[in-house]
Amino acid sequence: MDNKYEERLGTASMLPLILKMALPGFAAQLINLLYSIVDRVFIGHIEHIGTDALAGIGVTSSIIILISAFSQIVGGGGAPLASIALGKGDRERAHSILGNGFSLLVLFTVVTSGITYIFMEPLLRLIGASDATIGYATDYLSVYLTGTLFVMFATGLNSFINAQGRPGISMIAVIIGAILNIGLDPLFIYVFGMGVTGAALATVISQAVSAFIIVGFLVSDKATLKIKPKYLKPDIKIIGSLFALGIAPFIMASTESLVGFVLNGSLSGYGDIYVSTLTVMQSAMQFAAVPLSGFAQGFVPIVSYNYGKGNTDRVRLCFKYSVIIMFSFFALTNLFMITFPEFVAGMFTDDTALIKTVGRMMPLFLTGMTIFGLQRTCQSMFVALGQAKISLFIALLRKVILLIPLALILPNFLGVKGVYLAESVADATSAICCTTIFALTFRKILKKREQT
């Protein structure tokens, strides 16, 4: 088998390699973001019901994020382990990691979708759905859950394509699905008059197409890492390794859901318009966060592969370029949204009151995210280097240790503004802490690898 795609991770010029590996993931995640953003844009502009429907979809996002988070155990934990195994020349272990990951995704689908179906309405009420929004929330989520397996495959297996140096394939899968979603949304929502149900159906169909492309590649002869029947049998040691490293990406994603529970619950007491405001602002925040997640998926295989081979100079160089790119993008994107909040809000709604509310709250909500690019880079580096414990702590720090308590405490002193301000304070504090931890440990980690 021709391993040129794998070998270039250890030999190609670094900056062009990072761009070649990361930009497809960046573009793919930016386009993938359209799955949720386009739904919200079209739903928010439905005449007469747009604001309530938007709040209903915002409530479901906490559950959807939690379900999708389980795929990060496989994608976020398994792909770096597979890259390290490839770097060490251990192909047998790399194949086994992928096979066990595939089996876990099927198990996660059955468990998460089943539990959600059974307890759907109580969960939505708990998160903050009101009498005015519960119908839209259940309509959307009921359809979305039928495509859980497709979402798991599309998000959990994509990283294994990047791990073997083929980011273009994963980008194609996401782009095709996203373009299909953009076309189906207005057709189902407006032409067929299906409303929020149509938006969910468009997403399910689009994710199914992406999943078929990804799985199709991973079972083909073009793949270095392949899904093979003999590797689907659970291996307790490998599954343990997946959980050990993947628990940090899982917590990063799942605590986003927990944050949604807390924020939506707090805001529901002030009125549905504040829940809709949060939905708009979180969507805007994703314009910076989600594409950079795709960028990180591109440079993580480079770091993992070279760390496995002991090429620590290339690890350092990859970090240098990556942190500059990620910090700059995060800062510029957030500054734009803070400066023009009402313009951003107008993308999602025609409701004047909602646009003005977003205009007041957006600076409070996003200011701390301006330096978050530092944390996102350092956190991804820890995952790439197999530092599960540090990654786990950082994942817990921002959302569980800082954001959730702040979101519960600050409103007692600042009212509804305190709910939004909690995000900025937590983001800035955790970014500073994470960068400090990375500065103190990075050299030690690489030095230890050089001595083995």
Question: Which stretches of residues belong to each language-model region?
Answer:
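Short alpha-helical transmembrane segments in multi-pass integral membrane proteins
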Residues: 1-22, 82-149, 191-247, 303-368, ...
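Residue-level signal for short hydrophobic patches within transmembrane helices
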Residues: 11, 15-34, 38, 63-70, ...
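Transmembrane helical elements of multi-pass membrane transporters/channels
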Residues: 20-39, 143, 177, 206-210, ...
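Alpha-helical transmembrane segments of multipass membrane proteins
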Residues: 37-41, 114, 122, 156-160, ...
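Membrane-helix interface/capping residues of multi-pass secondary transporters
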Residues: 40, 51-54, 91, 120, ...
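Small-residue-rich hydrophobic transmembrane alpha-helices
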Residues: 54-114, 151-170, 264, 277-335, ...
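Short runs within selected transmembrane alpha-helices of multi-pass transporters and secretion channels
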Residues: 75, 144-162, 170-178, 199-214, ...
